[in-house]
Amino acid sequence: MNLKRRLSVSNDIELTPMMKQFLDLKAKHPDAVMLFRCGDFYETYSTDAIIAAEILGITLTKRANGKGKTVEMAGFPHHALDTYLPKLIRAGKRVAICDQLEDPKTTKKLVKRGITELVTPGVSINDNVLNYKENNFLAAVHFGKSACGIAFLDISTGEFLTAEGPFDYVDKLLNNFAPKEILFERGKRGMFEGNFGSKFFTFELDDWVFTESSSREKLLKHFETKNLKGFGVEHLKNGIIASGAILQYLDMTEHTQVGHITSLARIEEDKYVRLDKFTVRSLELIGSMNDGGSSLLHVIDKTISPMGARLLKRWMVFPLKDEKPINDRLNVVEYFFRKPDFRELIEDELHRIGDLERIISKVAVGRVSPREVVQLKVALQAIEPIKEACQQADNPSLNRIGEQLNLCISIRDRIEKEINNDPPLLINKGGVIKDGVDTELDELRQIAYSGKDYLLKIQQRESELTGIPSLKIAYNSVFGYYIEVRNVHKDKVPQEWIRKQTLVNAERYITQELKEYEEKILGAEDKILVLETRLYTELVQALSEFIPAIQINANQIARIDCLLSFANVAKENNYIRPVIEDNDVLDIRQGRHPVIEKQLPIGEKYIANDVLLDNATQQVIIITGPNMAGKSALLRQTALITLLAQIGSFVPAESAHIGLVDKIFTRVGASDNISVGESTFMVEMNEASDILNNISSRSLVLFDELGRGTSTYDGISIAWAIVEYIHEHPKAKARTLFATHYHELNEMEKSFKRIKNYNVSVKEVDNKVIFLRKLERGGSEHSFGIHVAKMAGMPKSIVKRANEILKQLESDNRQQGISGKPLAEVSENRGGMQLSFFQLDDPILCQIRDEILHLDVNNLTPIEALNKLNDIKKIVRGK
């Protein structure tokens, strides 16, 4: 049943005027929960009320809706909006905020209302909705004929980015930017979910939004330019369409004050290392795959400002692949590392800056509070010593940052002059503008505040004149200021006083003098609020002229913050500066896993390892060794050290020469994708296929236990073929680490000159395994899986039986040899490996065995067979 039918079941019953108003406004955004301002409350009705009550945990009640009818209602006080709105947004709801557009006191008719904002998961500037360490991106995807266009906008910071390319590139961007909401053309859901999955919050828009003409027109109008060449996106037809769709959506959601969106930047694919979503997830760059686990971001994020935290997260998934910008970052990190006084100065000032980026965005949209304006002033004051220190530093990169920082002295000093240092949160509370800023405001304050002092003087004077010591002057909203006299003294009241109210123990009076002062005082307070609001608005308008400069400041501060974080992490964890080289050599000495080493018990030292890969002598390393020995950790630490180096960080090692990597691929672990009909093995093969189709000579490839999802011989065959393909590839000889339990792959070293065998060593003492976690030359013969099973608490009978089977298998293999034998021949030789049903010495099983052995199957009728089955069933039940 639609909303209108729910509100009025029959056409004969008329809705109340307010409900008609609600329905008219609701029709503009039928899919959104509407918060309808009614006096001091925001109310929701009908299905919206049911949804709100469930999500917010508020009472569901009813409101009158015409003659004899009611409608569901749930509401909350208007001042609690910041508490309840985030809960609705986090629940994936779009919320239309409908406010009263006029003062109810000034009209006798229905109060005029309108939708002032549509808040969605991807479009919000509410601090309680936003995470200060994360961007809140809105994305739009356009499916073009030859490419897919994509755009990202964070309205809370003003960042606006676009790109286009094949589906896999767009998929990578979606996973790396992690938008909170994605827009696409109506009717394209199947195409979207088929390529990018169904995990995102999405919203469909009409097809006219995704046309080149409307999008280009919207962008040109917004940026006030004749073309888009200056942004470097003119050739991105599909990216332009996606970008224009985002601006159209801002109009639809009543976000029209967007002066802080000052540019549209192209995401330059060629500048960054390719990391697909599998790599980001399996390396646990941003979050852990396990509850309670840690991530690389958690270890290296020592940022101070919210802008720095957001930028660091971006750097993590967009490592650089050019030598100069990487070394520029490393040079700054080293300067911080070696100059503790400089580091301390910058740290102290960063603590004063706050979220400069989001504050200046609020200036543009007209939502900045007086306290945030003061914080902006404090930030600009803190930037001055940072600018001076950077300009004086013996480092060209810091010098350039210092040059770009703008002190915005005129607006900074104006804020200092005009705004109180500790203003209220809201302008309508008064006390925002300093004394001495405006003559009229000072005069009004004199009347308002000295007028109240004068009332006290009247009270003292009248008390003395009348001889009434308990006389007092007070105020209420019904008849304003009054004199209250207790009944015991009412005979002393002068005749000119006018009685207004009689109480049980007292009477209240007014005088002509009181009324005159009341008008002056109350009139002054109203005028003060109007004047303060006007002066504050003028200041904010002046501040909006500095948006571009302050955005540059925020970007540079974020950059400094990230590099300072790298230096502090390096100092704390004993990292060293990597050597970045434009070659194919990856030489890590005594490398450590940055996350695991932080999780070790106190006093336990991480076992460091060397890794050397190049395209000439040691291109592929095959790593064998027991379960739990540390093969997976070694693979991941190699990738993490490489990635840390290419985002400009020091690394956990004694030395590291990093030949630049253009792509990092990982095939580590697997999980079923049953929802789309894909098994573990299918997922594994899809990921491996993607890697092999995209590798280059500068790629770093990590395979861990490839082929586990199928039979042993299928797995060995596939693993062998993949390693051989990577080694023999005519152009893309990718540096590869291949961890496996297939010891047969150790034979490859004899036939392929750039494949080398290594193992993660263990020691066996008294039938117990000690994991040494050290990478050594040569292959391993054993996996020690049964030892691990024993450590996991497997029943002793199973461990014993497993050892028996293992000995038999090893004996068979020694006698016959598996290598080189056809799969069918080996399969025939598996007799005796399966547990015999009749070897179990259970009396019930023995009885069942006897029953079955004595059956004459050839002469057994169906009825007799069923009866015999019933007898066996009784034996099992013990009857």
Curated annotation (Swiss-Prot):
Coiled coil: none annotated. SUPFAM superfamilies: DNA repair protein MutS, domain I (SSF55271), DNA repair protein MutS, domain II (SSF53150), DNA repair protein MutS, domain III (SSF48334), P-loop containing nucleoside triphosphate hydrolases (SSF52540). Disulfide bonds: none annotated. It comes from the Bacteria. Signal peptide: none annotated. One of its GO terms (biological process) is mismatch repair. PROSITE patterns: DNA_MISMATCH_REPAIR_2. Keywords: ATP-binding, DNA damage, DNA repair, DNA-binding, Nucleotide-binding. ATP binds at G625, P626, N627, M628, A629, G630, K631, S632. GO terms for molecular function: ATP binding; ATP-dependent DNA damage sensor activity; damaged DNA binding; mismatched DNA binding. GO terms for cellular component: cytosol. SMART domains: MUTSac, MUTSd. HAMAP family: MutS. Belongs to the DNA mismatch repair MutS family. This protein is involved in the repair of mismatches in DNA. It is possible that it carries out the mismatch recognition step. This protein has a weak ATPase activity. PANTHER family: DNA MISMATCH REPAIR PROTEIN MSH1, MITOCHONDRIAL, DNA MISMATCH REPAIR PROTEIN MUTS FAMILY MEMBER. This is DNA mismatch repair protein MutS. It comes from Bacteroides fragilis (strain ATCC 25285 / DSM 2151 / CCUG 4856 / JCM 11019 / LMG 10263 / NCTC 9343 / Onslow / VPI 2553 / EN-2).
